[in-house]
């Protein structure tokens, strides 16, 4: 409660853990940085589905127009999904540590449990635990989880060796993604 989503909220229906992983990767982040909009006094990035999501070249065979069940057995999708699940688990444990919260079953079947602070001290601490604060402090475990995810995504593109060799700079990633985008638009 206290937060009402507006037109700035984007939902990605039908995107499984592998799609979530690609969207959380350095590859998509670079695409967002280059093709996304800027807004406000701080010139903050703003996601734009038309310029970013719809033009982003997902790894071949793992694109959002293909049902996730169709590539469930693809080792590339499985590796991305595993790394994405681990990243999500680590972030969730930091955002909502078991010692500060209790999970209460939702009254409507099928909805996730409600997360409630155990007491007022927990509520105060939980208010500080935001994704923004987490990424601003960038603990080592978060970097490790993102590197594992980025490696899985690089493998899906066929760029795993270059990623491990450290030759995939942000500019090189963007150039390769742009070439893929152009190839797919031309096909």
Specify the residue positions occupied by each region the protein language model found.
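S-adenosyl-L-methionine
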Residues: 1-187
């Amino acid at each position: 409660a206290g937060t009402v989503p507006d037109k700035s909220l984007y939902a990605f229906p039908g995107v499984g853990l592998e799609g979530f992983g690609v969207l959380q990767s350095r590859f998509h982040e670079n695409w967002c940085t280059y093709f996304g909009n800027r807004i406000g006094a701080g010139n903050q990035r703003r996601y734009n589905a038309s310029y970013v999501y719809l033009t982003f070249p997902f790894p071949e065979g793992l694109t959002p127009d293909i049902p996730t069940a169709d590539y469930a057995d693809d080792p590339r999708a499985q590796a991305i999904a595993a790394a994405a699940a681990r990243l999500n688990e680590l972030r969730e444990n930091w955002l909502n540590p078991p010692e500060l919260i209790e999970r209460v079953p939702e009254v409507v079947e099928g909805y996730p449990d409600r997360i409630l602070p155990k007491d007022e001290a927990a509520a105060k601490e939980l208010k500080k635990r935001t994704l923004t604060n987490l990424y601003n402090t960038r603990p080592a475990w978060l970097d490790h989880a993102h590197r594992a995810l980025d490696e899985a995504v690089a493998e899906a593109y066929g760029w795993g060796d270059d990623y491990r060799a450290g030759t995939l700079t942000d500019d090189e990633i963007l150039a390769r993604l742009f070439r893929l985008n152009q190839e797919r638009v031309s096909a």
